Structures are given as C-alpha cells and as structure tokens.
Amino acid sequence: MSNAPEVRGLFLKALGRPVIVAPSSAEPTVTFDGPLTEVCPCSLKETELPVVVRAGEETFEVRATATGERAINGRVALVTGGAQGFGAEIARGLVDAGCFVYVADLNGEGAAAKAAELGGEGVAHPITVNVADEESVAAMAAEIERVTGGLDLVVSNAGIVRAGSVLEQDASAFRLSTDI
C-alpha cells in the first residue's frame, strides 16, 4: 500500500489546507525516516510548497491546491456519473468553486472529454469506472491514490434509470439499479 494518503494527511494537518500528493522521480528535499505515524505535523508548518518528499521507498511531489474564499476551494472531489447530465454539471460547479475533480464514468471517452472541457490536467482527471463492479471501483481508488493521494469530497451520482414501473422489472434489472 502506498504512503501517499498518510503524507497527504500530514501536510493537511500541518498546513490546514488540502494538498495534492503525486509520485515523483525528482530528488527529495524532505525525507521521512521511520514510521509516518511518528512524524509530527508541527515539523512541516513552515514548509513551502511544492516540495518533493521521500517516505519509505516512495517519492512524492506535494503541491498546493488553489485557495480562495469558498469553503470547498482547493479540495479534491470525485463525481461518479460525471461525464454527462447532472454529474457533469456537478463536476463543473466543483471546478468553478476551485476543486480538483475526478470525472468518473462508465463512459471513459465521455469522462475524458468532460475532464478536458473542464480544464484538463491540474483541474480535472478522467477515470473509467463501473461502480457496480468491485474490481473497477478498487482500480479507481488506486488511480486516485496514485494521482492525488486521496479525496476530500465524494458525489455518488452514478445511476441507472429504467423506463416503466419498478414492479414490472425482473430481479436482475432491479438488482443492477440498486447495486449502483
């Protein structure tokens, strides 16, 4: 398991604001020796970002997210079903509020197009995911950990709407709707 979430948590506690933690091949300027649970966030309070951090065998760039007046500005968000409809507009609103947004959708091409429309790298990141499949969701979580080290907000918007009465659906159609 990656140290990225713990590194992100240390900087969040130290600086009082979210950061993005991404793998780096650059030379580290800060090295954590020993368990991260023993690192005092107070030792990082004066750290100027961006910084390259070595934690165990991993090296990360820790960079600031945008800051502003809104409470969610600078947060890292995930919107499932984010390629179209309500999800796309929620993603747009989060970007407009200053969030870095993962646009997650079963339609990978749609997610990529929406992420590019919202500003692309540094603002939005597409992820192809089937939220009804555990392995797909696990792969999404690994991608999020790799790219930013974690999340602050989750909008679980993905869903399936079927025409007709729920009373007339067969069991597999009903199960798929409720699994999502």
Segments (PLM) and residue ranges:
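Canonical Rossmann dinucleotide-binding motif of NAD(H)/NADP(H)-dependent dehydrogenases/reductases
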Residues: 70-102
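Rossmann-fold scaffold of SDR-type NAD(P)-dependent oxidoreductases
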Residues: 80, 151-158
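The beta1-alpha1 cofactor-binding region of Rossmann-like NAD(H)/NADP(H)-dependent oxidoreductases
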Residues: 108-109, 128-139, 171
